[in-house]
Amino acid sequence: MNISSSRRTSRRRTTALALLACLGAGLLSACQKPAADGPVVRIGYSAWPGWFPWAVTEAKGLFGKEGAAAKLQWFDGYLDSINALNAGQLDCNSQTLNDTISSIAGGADLQVVLQNDYSTGNDQIIAASGINSIAGLKGKKVAAEEGTVDHYLLLKVLKDAGLKGSDITFVPLETGAAAAAFAAGKVDAAGVYAPFTTQALKRPGSKALTTSKEHPGAISDLLVCRTEFVKKNPDQIQKVVNAWFATLKLIKQEPAATLPILVQRSGVSEPEFKAYDAGTTIQTLAENRQNFKPGTTMTSLPYASQQISTFLVEVGLAKTKPDISNLLNASFVDNAKE
């Protein structure tokens, strides 16, 4: 991923023993210096190109270097990570803006503290041969993960084409299962994101009818935390945000050392991974600071939040428009280390 473009006994004795254990295992590079006082920040992430940099953060010990006590938890299923955050099993999670607003509509109290990226092609509605437009999905079986990002994209493009969700036969499947079902010919189309797009497009004659490239800013990928945890532990959140931007800097400066980590976490080949580059626009620190400000396009998080809130109610993914007045917390990007 071309991050360089504009576009993831006594305390002393215990520490000494831990260091010796790392040395003995030949893992000195993975040993982090003792973090500052505060609870461990439990951070969830899942398969998405804009979140794979977190694997570099962990592998290169960047949480510790920034003084953060943080632990990453990988989820094979994206929805599982959202549910874990809502259940208090995580303190922060990597998730989209629309899914965060859906959670708030369901009663969750969450804050956005960082924008990792926005999708510029890696979310796709993929269809079988013979289906040449979104309008052609009418009456067809279409799979996606219900209530999450590509279900949102599917409903958005259906609405733009003058259709409703009821005009298709919706098949709710986890994203990986949706890609597999489409590749096997069990459904006519699927809404999936990278890296699952690679599997879906192996079906002969298949093609993307539309992608997030045609909907700039509609899908923002974020670090979202429980408001209660943010209020109690702002210093720890700040250090986590600092570690993210340190990670982007390292990926830019040392591509040979970091690319293998990104590729391994993605589970695809290096050429396949590099093909995702244009479809995920990583947001720099300067872009984060700008995007948290009010604006009139979907790249402005305040504007996008209002637009998405209205849309979720219109298509039935939320019963009422949620209160998002405290959703965006710009303080951590505003105070992040340059």
Please place each PLM-identified region on the residue numbering.
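Pocket-lining segment of extracytoplasmic ligand-binding domains
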Residues: 91, 98-99, 171, 177-267
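Phosphate-coordinating loops and pocket residues in cytosolic domains that bind phosphorylated ligands
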Residues: 139, 202, 329
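Conserved C-terminal helix/tail region of periplasmic/extracytoplasmic solute-binding proteins
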Residues: 305-338
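Secondary-structure end/capping motifs
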Residues: 232-317
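Short polybasic/polar patches that bind polyanions
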Residues: 64, 104, 159, 202, ...
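Short, low-complexity disordered leader/linker segments with a strong preference
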Residues: 1-40, 336-338
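Short, glycine-/small- and polar/acidic-enriched structural segments
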Residues: 34-172, 188-192, 207-210, 217
